[in-house]
């Protein structure tokens, strides 16, 4: 599902809200989530999951075009861990 598809689905369910209001709300939520992660904080949405940062250590990579070795710096990457309720719901839907 894309962001546009999410907006369309929410608009069809929440007919009292305009598409612009739904789009603005989603953009605001995502912006706050990105800002929270950028500050190094964790986000927990009970029943859904949590977002945190994982550190990837520096390593030696390879340029796929030339095959040359490249030093890659360490970095933080966003990580999502699904909650138990979400895992159970997905597994039940797929198993059915």
Swiss-Prot record:
GO terms for molecular function: DNA binding; structural constituent of chromatin. GO terms for biological process: DNA recombination; regulation of DNA-templated transcription; regulation of translation. Keywords: DNA recombination, DNA-binding, Transcription, Transcription regulation, Translation regulation. The keyword DNA-binding applies. Belongs to the bacterial histone-like protein family. Heterodimer of an alpha and a beta chain. NCBIfam families: hip, PRK00199.1. PROSITE patterns: HISTONE_LIKE (PS00045). It comes from Photobacterium profundum (strain SS9). This protein is one of the two subunits of integration host factor, a specific DNA-binding protein that functions in genetic recombination as well as in transcriptional and translational control. SUPFAM superfamilies: IHF-like DNA-binding proteins. The gene is ihfB. The keyword Cytoplasm does not apply. PANTHER family: DNA-BINDING PROTEIN HU (PTHR33175), INTEGRATION HOST FACTOR SUBUNIT BETA (PTHR33175:SF5). This is Integration host factor subunit beta. Pfam families: Bac_DNA_binding (PF00216). One of its GO terms (cellular component) is cytosol.
